[in-house]
A protein has these predicted regions:
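A surface-exposed partner-binding patch
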Residues: 1-115, 204-208
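Short glycine-rich, low-complexity/disordered patches
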Residues: 20-29, 62, 159-170, 199
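Short, surface-exposed beta-strand/loop micro-motifs that present aromatic residues
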Residues: 115-122
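Alpha-helix initiation and N-capping motif
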Residues: 3-7, 143-147, 159, 175, ...
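A short, compositionally biased
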Residues: 102, 124-127
Length: 208
């Protein structure tokens, strides 16, 4: 039960062991959901919904900040019914030019007001997650199943824009500022975090 075990571990760590370093501003999870349509969702996401129907977790560093903003993290895995809903007006706009695949994009982790992670709802892309900055006309492949994404998300503790670190690892470039902040501040907030372990986990779970 990788989904439940990893979340319980994260919850215990943030709520107890690190209470002097961070504050948990939101923790919410739903009971299992067995009413979703399996053939419309990635396989490993279906496995998640048999454990939780949704998962929301926000934390904020008590002292550490960058450019006047406290360091924080967010996990926001949506309910299946929300994922499969209509994302016009959020992900894409009819009157703005975009790739046709954007209209098939379904948001899974709505971790920021300006960005998210999801999948393109056609047979070719099932169990393969994509990153999207709102306002962009196409997505960026993460090269991860939802299960692999979840494992990395838990190790990253939902650190703000940790997904861009994955894009940098996958492409060998881009988002250098996000990578630098991640490497500097993660060990300061979470003493057991090691960059080398994160990279090793990425290499293990990425789609090859």
């Amino acid at each position: 039960m990788v989904y439940e075990d990893l979340f319980r571990k994260l919850s215990r760590e943030l709520m107890r062991n690190l209470s002097e370093v961070i504050s948990v501003t939101k923790q919410d999870l739903g009971n299992p959901d067995n009413k979703f349509t399996r053939n419309l969702l990635p396989n490993s996401l279906c496995d998640f919904y048999t454990i939780f129907s949704y998962l929301a977790f926000d934390w904020e560093a008590r002292e550490l900040s960058v450019d006047g903003e406290k360091l924080h993290g967010r996990i926001n895995i949506l309910k299946a019914e929300q994922v499969l809903g209509d994302w016009e007006g959020i992900v894409y706009f009819k009157n703005i030019s975009h790739y046709e695949s954007i209209e098939k994009f379904k948001v899974v982790d709505f971790f920021a007001d300006e960005a998210c992670v999801g999948f393109i709802s056609d047979d070719r892309s099932l169990d393969y997650l994509e990153y999207l900055d709102f306002g962009e006309t196409e997505t960026q492949p993460l090269g991860l199943t939802f299960e692999g994404y979840y494992e990395l998300m838990m190790m990253a503790r939902g650190f703000w824009y940790w997904q861009r670190v994955i894009l940098n690892l996958r492409n060998g470039k881009g988002y250098e500022n996000n990578v630098e902040q991640f490497k500097i501040y993660m060990p300061q907030i979470f003493p057991d975090f090691k960059w080398e372990d994160f990279v090793a986990l990425y290499e293990r779970v990425r789609i090859k």
